[in-house]
Design a protein with these regions (language model features):
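Sequence-level motif detector for i,i+2 pairs with an aromatic at +2
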Residues: 21, 84-87, 115
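Conserved short histidine dyad/triad with adjacent acidic residue
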Residues: 86-103
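A short beta-strand-loop-beta hairpin characteristic of the jelly-roll/cupin
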Residues: 111-124
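A generic structural motif
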Residues: 95, 105-107, 115-117
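Edge strands and adjacent loops of beta-rich recognition modules
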Residues: 75-90
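A broad, low-specificity signal marking well-ordered, structured residues that form hydrophobic/aromatic
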Residues: 87-90, 108, 118
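Non-heme Fe(II)/2-oxoglutarate
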Residues: 1-75
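Short glycine/proline-enriched turns and hinge-like loops at secondary-structure junctions
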Residues: 101-104, 121-123
């Protein structure tokens, strides 16, 4: 499957919430209209063991399938076709780094605009 980044970028220009936030959700849970709900780590609740929290997150994330912005017709179709959930868009300022971390569940990262000197480390 090829992804048209220009179409995605054009649609993302319509999200006014990105003017004041560095990330917003593209998918949400039923009944939620807060574009920030779901950003950040879902592991912040420190009750139970890490294994229990990761198991809970794996279930919770699958509920994030409702399109947050109905006007993102092309972007929403890509998310649906790829079976993605809890998707979000992030904006990073120049000379800013994404912190080194381990995601507890599988992720797909699609850089829309980047610098040729940027890189991502992927290890098992």
């Amino acid at each position: 499957m090829s992804i048209n980044l220009d179409k995605i970028l054009a649609e993302l220009d319509s999200i006014s919430e990105l003017d004041k936030n560095n990330q917003v959700m593209l998918q949400t849970v039923q009944g939620c209209t807060d574009p920030l709900y779901g950003t950040g780590s879902l592991l912040q609740d420190h009750n139970g063991t890490m294994e229990e929290r990761v198991s809970l997150v794996k279930e919770i994330e699958k509920e994030f399938v409702v399109p947050m912005f109905r006007g993102l017709v092309y972007t929403n179709s890509i998310l649906k076709d790829l079976g993605m959930y809890r998707s979000r868009v992030m904006i990073m300022k120049p000379k800013q780094c994404y912190s080194y971390h381990v995601d507890p569940t599988p992720r797909i990262h699609i850089p829309l605009i980047t610098n040729p000197d940027c890189f991502c480390v992927i290890e098992d």
